[in-house]
């Protein structure tokens, strides 16, 4: 790669360091304390005149004032000022700092802690070493990398110059670790299921397709973990969960990324009511772990995670917002006419279930800001959920919504192998009619159900969207370290 002028200047300094017999990228380093540890013990270390060694990246502008120089370093735990003098450091290394080191270089500094005359806690440096010479300079606007797409494309640079963004991903880690703790404490077993699958299922989505050369067969990146996890319930595990990546060949927008992280769990001898309780308790505990409270602000509005959350039947929610009663309009053309009368366009070939989904997404979902359960979905929208006994056209299914986004999806799981087989056949008919997101026929899963699956509650939670809410981010790309991006226009 060709270097620009600033990179060339830094490369020349790199050559000077090597010519002086120094390795600008040594294999080892030493530090006695992290910066956070040094600052926490500052008074004691000053009182004892302890010599300590810190490491970190030079951030901000270096200041050279005759025989004295200043710089700040940070190591991921904290930030501290380096105070360097020609008298303490010696001519050679003082001039090396002045002439050959730059912002973004990573250094090792030894000395003692003191406060400057202005009261700033500082390391008064007596020895200095280079650990990594940075060839790329900081972006022109040091206050932050301004271009949003470039921040996502060069996440490493984003994390250097916008250090507050690291807190988003620390919060994400707390979300996942707390989720694991909650499930482990409730007796769920963490398992791993295949990412490459011969059939795709467990969700309405288009898959990514790949090919296994040795086996000579098409494989799919999983769109959900559901069908394998339910096989484990059949096998005798009382409760299982998996946290991992799913992949859906769909559009990219503020709440969708083709590669995303899901938690799915299944509990034997439970139903969707038990899953609602689990969601309320788990997400309120997660919110408490991240923020120390169950009441937070998202995009300027207050959110309250405390249980119990409202429960609203889907048909009721749609009727309240649109006046359309989906329990009465079962004819496809009649439903499309009613939807069109309210200004919503849907494809002529869209199925009844797809039209209801579009209707709900347009008129109801944006209003679900507080944590809310939408329950009792039509059976046509829920091919893996158990029917409500006295309302067989609807299922024991709910979705959890927060801030207008679907965060969770859960069922009382369908365990009747004959009903499941017929649902799959209905999905095949939908696929033949043009629904590219319809389920495949999974005969092995039906065979598993024939051995008997106990009454089971199942739940999926979208971790990326949950992190969005808990870190007050309006775009899913801000909570994924390396989100999917289009190729550069100049590539």
Curated annotation (Swiss-Prot):
EC number of the protein: 6.1.1.6
Name of the protein this chain belongs to: Lysine--tRNA ligase
Listed GO MF terms: ATP binding; lysine-tRNA ligase activity; magnesium ion binding; tRNA binding
Keyword field: Aminoacyl-tRNA synthetase, ATP-binding, Cytoplasm, Ligase, Magnesium, Metal-binding, Nucleotide-binding, Protein biosynthesis
Subunit structure: Homodimer.
Family annotation (InterPro entries): Aa-tRNA-synt_II, aa-tRNA-synth_II, aa-tRNA-synth_II/BPL/LPL, Lys-tRNA-ligase_II, Lys-tRNA-ligase_II_N, Lys-tRNA-synth_II_C, NA-bd_OB-fold, NA-bd_OB_tRNA
Phylogenetic placement of the source organism: Bacteria, Bacillati, Chloroflexota, Chloroflexia, Chloroflexales
Reaction catalysis annotation: tRNA(Lys) + L-lysine + ATP = L-lysyl-tRNA(Lys) + AMP + diphosphate
Cofactor: Mg(2+)
EC category: ligase
Gene Ontology, cellular component aspect: cytoplasm; cytosol
Family statement: Belongs to the class-II aminoacyl-tRNA synthetase family.
UniProt keyword Ligase, yes or no: yes
């Amino acid at each position: 790669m060709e270097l620009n002028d600033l990179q060339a200047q830094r490369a020349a300094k790199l050559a000077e360091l090597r010519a002086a017999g120094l390795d600008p990228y040594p294999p080892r380093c030493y530090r006695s304390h992290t910066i956070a540890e040094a600052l926490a013990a500052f008074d004691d270390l000053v009182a004892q005149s302890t010599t300590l060694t810190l490491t970190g990246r030079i951030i901000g502008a270096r200041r050279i004032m005759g025989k004295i120089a200043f710089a700040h370093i940070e190591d991921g735990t904290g930030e501290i000022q380096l105070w360097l003098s020609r008298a303490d450091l010696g001519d050679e290394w003082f001039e090396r700092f002045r002439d050959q080191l730059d912002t973004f270089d990573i250094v090792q500094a030894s000395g003692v802690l003191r406060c400057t005359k202005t009261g700033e806690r500082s390391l008064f440096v007596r020895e200095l070493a280079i650990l990594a010479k940075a060839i790329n300079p900081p972006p022109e606007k040091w206050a932050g990398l301004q271009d949003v797409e470039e921040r996502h494309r060069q996440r490493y640079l984003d994390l250097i110059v916008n250090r507050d963004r690291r807190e988003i991903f620390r919060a994400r880690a707390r979300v996942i670790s707390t989720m694991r703790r909650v499930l482990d404490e409730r007796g769920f077993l963490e398992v791993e299921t295949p990412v490459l699958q011969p059939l795709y299922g467990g969700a309405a989505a288009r898959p990514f397709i790949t090919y296994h050369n040795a086996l000579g067969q098409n494989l799919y990146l999983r769109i959900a973990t559901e069908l394998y996890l339910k096989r484990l319930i059949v096998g005798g595990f009382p409760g299982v969960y998996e946290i991992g990546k799913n992949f859906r060949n769909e559009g990219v927008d503020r709440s969708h990324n083709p590669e995303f992280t899901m938690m799915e769990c299944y509990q034997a001898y439970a139903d969707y009511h038990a899953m609602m309780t689990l969601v309320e308790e788990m997400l309120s505990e997660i919110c408490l772990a991240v923020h120390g409270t169950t009441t937070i602000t998202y995009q300027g509005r207050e959110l309250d995670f405390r249980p119990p959350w409202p429960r609203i039947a889907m048909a009721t929610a749609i009727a309240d917002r649109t006046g359309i009663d989906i329990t009465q309009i079962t004819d496809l053309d009649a439903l499309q006419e009613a939807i069109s009368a309210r200004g919503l366009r849907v494809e002529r070939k869209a199925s009844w279930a797809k039209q209801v989904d579009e209707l709900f997404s347009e008129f109801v979902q944006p209003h679900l800001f507080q944590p809310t359960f939408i329950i009792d979905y039509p059976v046509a929208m829920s091919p893996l959920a158990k029917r409500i006994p006295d309302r067989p056209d609807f299922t024991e299914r709910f979705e959890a919504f927060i801030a207008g986004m679907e965060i969770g999806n859960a069922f009382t799981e369908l365990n009747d192998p004959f009903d499941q087989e017929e649902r799959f056949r209905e999905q095949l008919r939908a696929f033949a009619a043009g629904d590219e997101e319809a389920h495949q026929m999974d005969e092995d899963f039906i065979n598993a159900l024939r051995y008997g699956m106990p009454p089971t509650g199942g739940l999926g939670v979208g971790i990326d969207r949950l992190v969005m809410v808990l870190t007050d981010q309006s775009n899913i790309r801000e909570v994924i370290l390396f989100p999917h991006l289009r190729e550069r226009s100049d590539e």
